[in-house]
Amino acid sequence: MLSSSHLPTTIVTPKNVPTLGVLVGGGPAPGINGVIGAVTIEAINNGYRVLGFLEGFQNLILQDDSKIVELTIDSVSRIHFEGGSILKTSRANPTKKQEDLQKVVKQLQKFNVSLLVTIGGDDTAFSSMSVAKAANNEIHVVTLPKTIDNDLPLPYGIPTFGYETAREFGANVVRNLMTDASTASRYFIVVAMGRQAGHLALGIGKSAGSHLTLIPEEFLPTTDSTEPEVTFSRICDMIEASIIKRLYTSKKDHGVIVLAEGLLEYMSTDELKQAFGSSLKYDAHDHIMLAELDFGRLVRDEMRERMNRRGLKIAFTEKNLGYELRCAPPNAFDREYTRDLGNGAVRYLLNGGNGALITVQGVKMVPLSFDDLKDPRTGKTRTRQVDVSSEGFQVAKRYMIRLEKKDFEKEETLKGLAATAKCSVEDFIKQFKYLVQ
């Protein structure tokens, strides 16, 4: 199979021929190579030269001609089976400086690129919008929605490519952890990627049947005037309550808890600084680098301390679930999906289209205008969050182990929970009743 090390090494020179460019921004996701292959084949079959720009916008900003490769049908015809990206990727942000945007446009024009396909998530979509405007629409740009987070503003029920593979891979990991938990009598605290939305954590937890899955959306306010109720103590109270209830109802001292890393995104800066101190780092788009924070370890240590105080002998192990999902070989769904997306992107551009996110809805390719994707408050790409009022989320909750109002209404149950927690009924109510109000 072709890898980035096997790409053509011939130095690319500008040619006065119709040219389409393709680049990848942001983190990897299963299916990137499938898109690159589909775009390349369709463009060449329509008379275009196809250039791949290595490492996203980074080398366009640097105007490094050595980081450009010419793609051929032969070089991409079988790459759709492989994870990763033959064009690599980066998080370089050309919107930080106006001069960087102009460098990108100048470099694209130097190589006669009139059509540009970018593959990425919310930040890449925003950068693509900016490039199209900086080029005065002389370069037509489309973005293909890539992220395992599944948080781009597509219509509900339509995934971003890579999500389905990541969900399947993650659910299989959690299934194995469940067997390990049962065998070794321990709890696993699994932290799944998802900076601003809990789609991946919920998809993994629901399809694997984890005992509790927590995502940021269920803590978000219903009005803009209310602060999110995401605190470290609340998260740990919910986990502790789930463990106590499972121990009371089924006498089981093991299980798997899935947490979305995005829970950290909605905690206050003061709380994050208190928990992580100088280890807080930011990326080129000013996002806290959540993957660099050991959220699972923090929760693990807190739960160990809580159980020890109660005199309960329960073991905990943390597991971060993220990087191993991003470059998994795409499953059949994502291989088919990316072929549709790549083909649709080229056809849209050839028909004069510009400034859109390409989607497949039902049996049709549907472009979504960049302008319609923007959050009017920030000017950046909107985030699609989990709809906690949806039947899908409510079904997921019903199969979790959580405290419910009825647990506090039945005296026998309440006494049993308190006895399991080795505390008085009054203390149990004081600590946990707010979770069901």
UniProtKB/Swiss-Prot annotation:
GO biological process, one term: response to glucose
Protein name as annotated: Pyrophosphate--fructose 6-phosphate 1-phosphotransferase
Main function: Catalyzes the phosphorylation of D-fructose 6-phosphate, the first committing step of glycolysis. Uses inorganic phosphate (PPi) as phosphoryl donor instead of ATP like common ATP-dependent phosphofructokinases (ATP-PFKs), which renders the reaction reversible, and can thus function both in glycolysis and gluconeogenesis. Consistently, PPi-PFK can replace the enzymes of both the forward (ATP-PFK) and reverse (fructose-bisphosphatase (FBPase)) reactions.
Localization in the cell: Cytoplasm
pH curve summary: Optimum pH is 6 for the forward reaction and 7.5 for the reverse reaction.
GO molecular function: 6-phosphofructokinase activity; diphosphate-fructose-6-phosphate 1-phosphotransferase activity; metal ion binding
Keywords from the named record: Cytoplasm, Glycolysis, Kinase, Magnesium, Metal-binding, Transferase
InterPro entries noted in UniProt: ATP_PFK, PFKA_PPi_Ttgales, Phosphofructokinase_dom, PKF_sf, PPi-PFK_TM0289
Activity regulation details: Activated by AMP. Probably promotes oligomerization of the enzyme.
Residues the record lists as binding substrate: T147, I148, D149, M193, G194, R195, E261, Y323, E324, L325, R326
Pathway: Carbohydrate degradation; glycolysis; D-glyceraldehyde 3-phosphate and glycerone phosphate from D-glucose: step 3/4
Cofactors demanded by this protein: Mg(2+); Mn(2+)
EC number(s) stated in the UniProt entry for this protein: 2.7.1.90
Organism the protein comes from: Naegleria fowleri
Similarity field: Belongs to the phosphofructokinase type A (PFKA) family. PPi-dependent PFK group II subfamily. Clade 'Short' sub-subfamily.
Residues noted as binding Mg(2+) in the record, renumbered to the chain: D122
Swiss-Prot/TrEMBL site (Important for catalytic activity and substrate specificity) positions: D123
Any one GO cellular component localisation term in the record: cytosol
Reaction it catalyzes: beta-D-fructose 6-phosphate + diphosphate = beta-D-fructose 1,6-bisphosphate + phosphate + H(+)
